[in-house]
Amino acid sequence: MTDKVLKRKQLLKVKRKLRTRGKIFGRADKPRVSVFKSNKYFYAQAINDELGVTLASVDGKKLGLGNNKENAKQIANEFATSLKKAKITEVVFDRNGYLYHGVVAAFADTLRENGIKL
């Protein structure tokens, strides 16, 4: 891709991130689940925005799982168990500017299957 196309894609991602982030807010009873995906790994964390603390997190790198749909499902299963240990059953999903497709969608769907209400 040309440099101009890459800059445009990055700008659109930042605009999506700011637009969605302005509308959602995590509380202690309903934290925000923020996802991040790199070229190799997938990460997620539950955040209480009132206090600015992370309540639960999962790291695909520590689990040795790469960034694909099957691994995102395993990461979501691990994350759901850590949320249940923290007695969290309802969350707000922050896709962090990523399109709701592929790995992000597989992660969210698996969280729903594990009884976490998004």
Swiss-Prot record:
**Xref: Pfam families:** Ribosomal_L18p
InterPro entries associated with the record: Ribosomal_uL18_bac-type, Ribosomal_uL18_bac/euk
**Domain of life of the native organism:** Bacteria
GO biological process assignments = translation
Record carries keyword Lipid metabolism: no
Ordered alphabetically, the record's keywords are: Ribonucleoprotein, Ribosomal protein, RNA-binding, rRNA-binding
| The UniProt record lists the keyword Cell membrane | no
Please give the CDD domains that the UniProt record associates with this protein.
Answer: Ribosomal_L18_L5e
Give the GO cellular component terms, alphabetically.
cytosolic large ribosomal subunit
Membrane-spanning regions, if any?
Answer: none
Q: Recall the GO molecular function terms of this protein's record.
A: 5S rRNA binding; structural constituent of ribosome
Q: Which family does it belong to?
A: Belongs to the universal ribosomal protein uL18 family.
**Its job:** This is one of the proteins that bind and probably mediate the attachment of the 5S RNA into the large ribosomal subunit, where it forms part of the central protuberance.
Assembly behavior? Part of the 50S ribosomal subunit; part of the 5S rRNA/L5/L18/L25 subcomplex. Contacts the 5S and 23S rRNAs.
Protein name from the UniProt record:
Large ribosomal subunit protein uL18
Q: Tell me which species this is from.
A: Helicobacter hepaticus (strain ATCC 51449 / 3B1)
Q: Give the source lineage, highest ranks first.
A: Bacteria, Pseudomonadati, Campylobacterota, Epsilonproteobacteria, Campylobacterales
